[in-house]
Amino acid sequence: MPDQPHTASRPPLATRGADLEHLTRETWDVLIVGGGIVGCGALLDAASRGLRAALIEQDDIAVGTSSRSSRLVHGGLRYLEQFHVGLVREALHERARLLELAPHLVRLEKFLFPLYGRPAVTRSFYESGMVLYDLLGSAKRGGRHHHLSVDAALELAPDLRREGLQGAMLYSDGMEDDARYTLAVLRTAIREGGLAVTRVTAVKAIRDGGRVAGATVRDELTGVELDVRAAAVLDATGVWGARPDRPFGSEKATFNVLPSRGSHILVPRERIEVRTGVTIRVPGKVAFMVPWPRHWVIGTTDDPFTGPVDRPSASGPEVERILAAVNSAFDVGLSREDIVGTYAGLRPLIAPSGASSTVKVSREHKVAVEDRGLVRISGGKYTTYRLMASDAIDAVLGADAKDRPSGTADLPIIGAAPRPELDALIARLSREPGMDVESARSLVDRHGTEAETVVELGRRRDLIRPLVAGQPMIEAEVAWAAEHELALSLDDVLARRMRLAMTLRDRGESIASRVAAIAGDVLGWDAPRQAIEAARYLEGAHREFDVPA
């Protein structure tokens, strides 16, 4: 099917109203609760099998864990130390698949792993790990790792701490924009026939004759409660499954969810001179410096979390630990003043009995049929979402799964095209009035083949200009987000569609009114409503993404 937005020319809120009516009129084969990467992947998986499938999300798509990762598509080097070989192999195979299915959103990046300590012991220990990583699948698309001398390592990373440096390993791993990838999976599912409605909360299960037969839901924009009927419900709520008041709680629950907080900082790229990504060994784990267009995304922590799961933020001690990790490997004296933003996500780990630390808790996932008509999934890694989704829909179908297999292994994500075609599109768009190579590349890296349609929208509405002076994103992307990407607030646009909430030191105060005006033109906001929306966004953005005290 062609890569066309599902909303056509209808106003987004009118379309949402029609979708809500459809949601309550139909009896679905499966109702998916949760709009993270697993829920969106499950909607696509179900649609690929020809099922009548719907998804509800209480807030925005990818508002939780799926927009707050380290932005890596990887096997997980550190899991080899814990002997989770099967998990690493599975993740590396999926990394190769995602590079094929979404080359505009997933790419390979070189990572430098500096080696410190006794030369023979250090090199042999990490060399064996890298060889195993290659054998398990990393070499399939990324090539084999290389050992670098001290001089070669310093050529790539002049700011490396020289004392005790024994050289480095150079290997490849994948990276992506997690929020935009999740959104693209959802929009692909809609293209394939799935239905998704945001700002709809599951209140309680509907039970019929001892089985779960749907859910009573609440439209968060109106407060109205509605009944949605389904042959099966899939609970893909992630860390929200740790709440004792979850709507699909069951006496037959086979596992508990243990939230683990992973925090990150963002630092200007020019602050640390390195030509690759970096993997830093710290006691008990590794930290990553992931190259973003103008920033380093640095993290992560791994601590049990017992606070509210909505909108977590980094803590002061976590930020200090991340700074210490960077300064242990680089002679840069990185400090809090260098940080432009922070963020935190919660991993929905499967809790082993008596666990006091999350560092060594398995990242494998579990699927359970907890009641007739109720399937629950949690755990896992972002990289393996497609397999998780397939397992979940297999459980929904039960014995019928073998006759209706998943079709996502070869289903390109919306906006995908071979890399040469994407490069040609960048060259073509860079010649458009008001565009240059950086803005064209920025558009294609986030929208793929749809970048051309975004530019056409911008031409029609006079929105081909930078949203932020000196940065590549254009105003047309705000209108596109509101019209075609299910964005209903400034937070949706700036935190997840454009990722500016965490990369601008002012959290977007200088552009909030302009963004509200552009989005408001699509969403029907008058001037007072625009001011309210801008103020609401800024209050939340400062709370979530500012450097903590």
Task: List each language-model region with its residue ranges.
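C-terminal accessory subdomains/tails of enzymes that are appended
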Residues: 59, 105, 116-129, 148-163, ...
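Core beta-strand elements of the Rossmann-like FAD/NAD(P) dinucleotide-binding domain
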Residues: 26-28, 222-232
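Extreme N-terminal leader/targeting segments of oxidoreductases
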Residues: 1-30, 45-49
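Short hydrophobic core segments
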Residues: 33, 228-238
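A conserved short coil-to-beta-strand element within the FAD-binding core of flavoproteins
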Residues: 198-213
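Glycine-rich Rossmann-fold phosphate-binding loop(s) that bind the pyrophosphate
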Residues: 34-36, 58
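Glycine-rich FAD pyrophosphate-binding loop
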Residues: 47-67
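Dinucleotide-binding Rossmann-like beta1-alpha1 core, especially the glycine-rich loop
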Residues: 71-156
